[in-house]
Amino acid sequence: MASSAPSSSSCTFQAESSFGPAVASCRRAFDFTLYFEEVVFVLVPSCVFILLAATRLLFILRRARRFTTATAATTTSTDTSSSHSCGNAAQNQHTPIGHGLAHHHILQQCTAGLLVTLHVAGLILLCTTVPSRQRTDLSVPASVVAALAFGVVPVLAHFEHKRRRPSSGPRSSSLLVGLFLCVAVLLRAPLVRTHAALYGSGSALVAVEIASLVLQLVLIAVGEVSSWAADATSNFSPEESAGFLGRSFGSWLWGTFVTGYRTTLSLDSLVPIDSSLESRIVATSFDHILPVSPSGKPGKNGQYRLLLALFRSLGLYALAPVIPRLCLAGFTLAQPFLASATINYIGNGPAPDRDGYGLIGATFLIYTGIAVSTGWYWSLSYKNVTKIRGGLVDGVSQKMLRLSQQHGTESKVLTMMINDVYRITSTLAYAHELWVAPIETAIGTWMLCRHVGPPGLVVLGIIGVCLGTSTYVGKHMAIQQGVWLAAVERRIGATKKMLASIKAIKMMGAGPSVAEALERLRRLEFAASRKFRALIVGTLLSSYSTATLAPVLVFGTYIGATTAAADFSASTLFTSLIWISLLASPLIQLLQIIPSFGAALGSLERIDAFFEKQEFTDERDEATAVDSSCSEKGEKKKEHVSLSIHNSSFSYTDDSEDPILKDVNLVINRGQHVVVTGPAGCGKSLLLQAILGEVAPQNSGSRVCVDGKVAFCSQTPWLENLSARQVVSRFSRDKDPSWTDRVVDACELREFLEAQDPDATIGSQGSMLSGGERQRLALARAIQSRPDILLLDDVLSPIDYVTKKRILRQLFGKSGILHETGTTVVQVTQDHAVAQLADIVLRLDETGALRPYQFPPSQADVEDENGDVDNGAENTRPRESSHTTEAQSGPPEPKSKPTEITDRKVYATYFESIGFLNLVLFIGGGIIFAFCLKFPNVWVGWWTADSSDPDEASHNIGYWFGIYAMLNVLPLIAVAGWVAQLMMLIVPLSGSKLHRKLVDTVSKATFSFISRVDTGSLLNRFNQDLMFVDSRLPLDLFNTAAALLTGIAQVILIGVSAVYVLASIPVLAAVLFLLQHFYLRTSKQLRHLDLQSKAELHTRLSESYQGLATIRAARWQRQVHAEFQAGLDRSQAPVYLLWMVQTWLKLVLNLVVAGLALVVMGAAVGLHQHGSSSGASASASGIGIAFLNLTTLGETMTNLLTAWTSLETTLGAIARIVSFSRDTPAERDVLVRPDSLDHGGGGGGDRAEPPESWPESGGIKLEGVWATYDDDDESDENTDDSGGRPATDVAADGEKHEATTITTTSSTMTTTHYALKDISLEVRPGERVAVCGRTGSGKSTLLLALLGLVAVRRGRISIDGRDVAGVPRARLRGAVHVIPQDPFISVASGNGETIREALDPAGKLGDEEVTDVLQDCGVLDKIVGAGGLAASVSDEALSLSAGERQLFVLARLICRAGGRCRHGGGGILLLDEATSSLDVNTDGKTAEVLRKWLPNMTVLSVLHRLEAALKYDRVVVLEGGRVAHVVTPSESTVSSDIFAFFGRSRSFLESRETGGVSWLE
């Protein structure tokens, strides 16, 4: 190639051999030197790629070897939880790579090979066709290194494809390869341009290089479409199979956006996420966040131990966001240079066109670089915090399974899982801002000083003051957050009690008092958070101080240091302001983050303290480790000993000086059936806890040994909200259907299961079932697991006698399955029928001593030995359950999804909660703040325009600066008042109203609905949703409003300063509208799924904690944890995808800003070049104002997006509250209109509110009652009594009549399952009636019907002649006294309620009378031990057993109703198996207590014991929802049917009447 002789050395080829970087203009205009391009564009990226590729290859090969070893070790094991995993668990399956990916890989390898060939050809042409004088010293080495780098590409791509982690998905193109190819294309293009200029565009070398560039683009495209080939054949994450560009611009999310836009997303329809986020992988990486040997005390490093452990668990991935963050910092800090160059270009007159084109190109590179680096930075940061979330939640669940059950632990776990983990993850997402902010500050200050000199250092002073303030606030914020979260825990604990006891609360009519107690706790919570919220106000005020005060201090110092007449050029002033704004804008965020870090450290400290808690020690393991035999050392072993306890004393607390069980010695051989009995509160359940290892012996030299697999059934059955069939086989690995059939038949569940819908759930803790059905399910589940040792804690007490006798014979009889399998059984019971079949009977007395015992013989024993109990009326018709449930595959959420709740309704609900005046003040405060914040920019524009010509200035600099300083102080005053109003007034006001809305919805919901909803789902609304309302929503609302109003002001300023930009505003508005329209549909659904999936975690944690003893007894922890991990995977997917779509939106908005910047720059350059002739030109001050706002507009829009998307999430919580409140069926206050009632017997009194004294006498009358749990149409047929009335009315004139009239009707109702069918019954005032029947016969339903808790479709129920259908339900339940089956004491733990106030809130009785009641009920000693009547009523303080709780509730009822009844008043008392947990002697005494304290009260009692039933005036037996028998025990002639029902004969009554021996006595 020929060239002209150079005129100087700078214009010869020697100029190309210098580093430059710019080449002399006489050679080429606006270009780099060849040497610079070879070093920077070829050598550096190629060498870096080769080093990184070698490191990656070593990592892949080492990982492949580790996986091969791990696979060999794990293929022999079976995942016991696979049947319970769902949703995104599918991504765990190792789907083989299909033909599409194989063909794609071949194409990629062929393209890469051809590319290497072209590079080798180019190297040959460079050496052969280009003279050495036209090459630099690095031309050939650079080409060799480049060829080597491209030779590594197919090698690395091949190993990424073949040696991938099996669960990680197909990666046909490595991210590293994609990054290198994209960088190589961008950098290689200028080099090809240089070669074309040097060697001619038609040379062979240039042609090969152009072909190489094209082939690189093809290879990039091949890599980008790898995800399309993968999606067709696999179920792997589209993110992992996406290429570099797909990851950079978020194209892998397009499938999610399209699906969300067109259809409704569900947890199962979400795309699989990155396999590195799978819980099993995260748990392995984060396993050391749990202390190896927890000491029960905080760790040595305190809050930093867990923080360091988290980052250590992330490993090098913790540093992944560093590179994109540095790139983002570089692009951001380049903006002032661009602005300064643009202002100089505009202000310095004509300039070459290439300078303008260079500015446009620089604008494109800078703002596009900001967009892409922002996307990468936040995607990598969110991936890390998603891992941290998974690790922390998984760690909390693991730790919970290792702890002993203690009061408050469950609420603490739920609070940590939601509140603390959220605070930690949302804060740690900004972790890298902590180290990059000082770097940006240092560079920005240095550059500021270059413009204004030493006065620029003043900005460091204000930054230091603000940082010190934020650090101080952060330290105290952690303390105040602890105080606040402690109050949250108390409220959550009380709410959990309320939800768990919702049936008892509704029956007792305690809803209003419970709601008031929860509201009181809510108020205490806001009082506890007041200082925390005040600190937030201080934080926000401090964060805005730098942005507003720094310009004033810098310019003031500059003016004072120079002369009073000093003036600024537009370039100096606006460049300085841009640097200050770039310093202040991230500092606003940083100064808000620092206190948040303090709060996050406080949360880490709370979780770490939880991790350090002393763990449950399984004494069985320790004993078995010492000696595999449970026999005494030195003792000749004749029989195999299953369990033994030697010289051991036990108590519920380790520090108790007086053990409950003392010097226990017990040896039980394999196959023995041992019964333990004793009075209430003597320690029977504690003995079982000791055998389980849940409590440790308190004396030295003790020994507890258990040999074999254990199963445990507690007195309160632990059941999960599954179908009944799933419960039975829940933890069974035995797939033998014949064994399952035997267990189902032995537990008398066959007919019950056949009557159930296969998909119907049983409700939280089996709330849709009767007590007997719950216990039988738990018993079947335990036996199904084939235990060696079975521990039963009074599980048969809620079961009717006949069913119980069958179960006893089929389980414990000589042909029973437990006898056949040689299962050792230890059973706590008060039931003599159970004791009959025991090999050993032991009794615990009040002193804690365990002694052999023999029940006295009774006539019942003789009958049971001589006759079969399976005769009589119980076989005359099939048994039916009164608790059949509708098909329910999960908890019944509101019928409409939250997405159906419009935004208008959500905002209206929130604005209604804060009040109209507060709303107006908030909007006004925001507008004032935005105006005050941005108006100084306009003032600066006027200032520079006026000062451009000092001779014509209208005002001196003091005028301009003084007003400028005042204007910059106004935003601080405005923001202080604005935020104070929000945090101190709006937050408690809205939080209280929304909490009350939830409480009212739950308390007023129909019983049939609320009993089917998962407790975890409900609790999630009181926990997570209200946490969003209290802590997230106010800050999100403030940040959204501030960013929105500020952004509007910036756009206005840009448009006013650069008028030509106004033409792009409509286009910008249209783009933003379409963007939000497309984005919001998906993001809203993901937010809902995020909240929904956390409800599942709530449920799993809550259910697991309630069943800890049962789970640990059978060692089901691993399976429970695996299932929790499956639920955590389902929860991680929407969380991660929501963060990713938010990152995508940030990327797109930054690209929009890039487009706006290009419009500004292009118009400015165009007007400068061509506008002089037409008179249209851009002013320097106008461009300065435009760029001053443009440099921060992108960050403003990003902040707006971040705050707005977070606000949408919190508003999603309000949408859930609105949806739940709207779609939850509420009880009607009055079932029918009073004027439509049939007043038979009631006269006209039904039309008015019952008098205060109602019911005065307590008479009850049921006439042809048909009742159902179906509440879809409560009022249906309530006003139509035809067909439901008895044939003849029972007179109400006081004459003696048969108390019960049994009628039949011809009407048949087959469309609805009726729990009560044509019940007619009359109970006279003061009469005591026992209601008996088989399990599920409708006994409890009868009481629920009386209380209006189930729908009475036909018939009539009246009390004292008044139809209860016309009585408000709250009034009805308040007038009837109830003791439910599951005793409920109080939710008010922690708010100061005393035992005295709980027993007699109205103060009707004196302390002596209250003490007498407690003494008669047998719980006075417990109350005295807890601190007397002035002690707290909390469960932790009382420590009552199940039986003692029933006695306490009885005492409370007597205290509240006894005054009236003892002075001649009547009333009604309903007992729903209220003494089922008491021994027979105590049960008998309760009847005497009731007669003593409530002599005139009408009693309707559901019970199972014949001995107790015979103490009542009459006995009613129900079967299949109908009245089967009614007898009066005192009659001389009684039908034998009633005794046949109880498995007794007539002789039993005769022995009772003649003083025969009875074990009751």
UniProtKB/Swiss-Prot annotation:
Its main location: membrane. One of its GO terms (molecular function) is ATP binding. InterPro entries: AAA+_ATPase, ABC1_TM_dom, ABC1_TM_sf, ABC_transporter-like_ATP-bd, ABC_transporter-like_CS, ABC_transporter_C-like, ABCC_6TM_D1, ABCC_6TM_D2. GO terms for cellular component: membrane. This is ABC-type transporter phomO'. Glycans are attached at residues 384, 647, 721, 1189, 1496. Residues 326-599, 920-1209 form the ABC transmembrane type-1 domain. Residues 1269-1280 have a biased composition (Acidic residues). ABC-type transporter; part of the gene cluster that mediates the biosynthesis of the phomopsins, a group of hexapeptide mycotoxins which infects lupins and causes lupinosis disease in livestock. Signal peptide: none annotated. It comes from Diaporthe leptostromiformis (Lupinosis disease fungus). It is a multi-pass membrane protein. CDD domains: ABC_6TM_ABCC_D1, ABC_6TM_ABCC_D2. The chain crosses the membrane at residues 34-54, 110-130, 139-159, 172-192, 202-222, 314-334, 358-378, 428-448, 452-472, 535-555, 577-597, 913-933, 969-989, 1037-1054, 1147-1167. Residues 853-899, 1229-1298 are annotated as: Disordered. Belongs to the ABC transporter superfamily. ABCC family. Conjugate transporter (TC 3.A.1.208) subfamily. It is found in: Membrane.
